C-alpha cells in the first residue's frame, strides 16, 4: 500500500524548529514535502502575492530536500501545488510557535491561512500550533532558543494518522489543533473563542521627531465553556473543526425583511 503524501508548510519560515518537528513526526509514516516561506511570515493571514514575482529555491535542510519561497505561507502552498505539481493527500501547516485560537487569531494567522487555502484548492488540511510560555519566543530567531517538541510530535503523529486513515469529519475539511505548553491533560473538541487580545496602538517618536506606531495586544480571557481558549488554558489539546463558509445563515431571514423597505 503506497504511503500517503503530505505537503508541509508554515508561517514561521524554513528555519523553524516547529516545522522540522512536524516533518520528523510525519515522515515516519508518510512522504512529506516541505515548501515553506524563506523568512518569518507570522500574522499575514491568507494573503497572496499578486503584485510581485515569487522565487522558489531548492535547499537541503536537516539532510532533507526542501523548498523555500520568498513570499507568504499561501504563496508557498500554491507554488507547491502548482509550481511543483504536488498532489498531496493532506496539507499540514505548522507546528506554529504560539497558539492560534479564537475568532481574532485564526483570521490573521499565516499558519491557518495556508491551511485555509489548501481547503480552497480542494485538499484537506490540519493547522498545528504550540502554546509558548515565553511570548518573546514566538517571533525570535528560531536558532536563538530551544523548544521541547516531544509532546507536540506525539500529537502531530496521532492526529495526522487519524485523519489520513479515517478522513475528515462531515462538514469540515480543516482542523485547527492547538497544543498546550505544559503537560497535556487530554483532548477536547472545541469552538472558537471570542477574543484573545485587547487591541491598542502605541505611538512613538523616531530620532528625527516623526511619529511611528506599534499595534499591541494585551491578553484577555473571556470564560467560555467549550472554547479553544478555555481548553488551552486548562492544558487540553484543542481540536477545532473549521468551515470555509463565513455566511451568517441565522441573519438571512431578518435581513430579507429589512431590505424589503429599500425603495
Curated annotation (Swiss-Prot):
Cofactor requirement: a divalent metal cation
EC class name: hydrolase
Location relative to the cell: Cytoplasm
SUPFAM superfamilies linked to this entry: SurE-like (SSF64167)
Signal peptide segment: none
Binding-site residues, a divalent metal cation: 11-12, 42, 96
Role summary: Nucleotidase that shows phosphatase activity on nucleoside 5'-monophosphates.
Protein name (database record): 5'-nucleotidase SurE
Taxonomic source organism: Methanocorpusculum labreanum (strain ATCC 43576 / DSM 4855 / Z)
Gene for this chain: surE
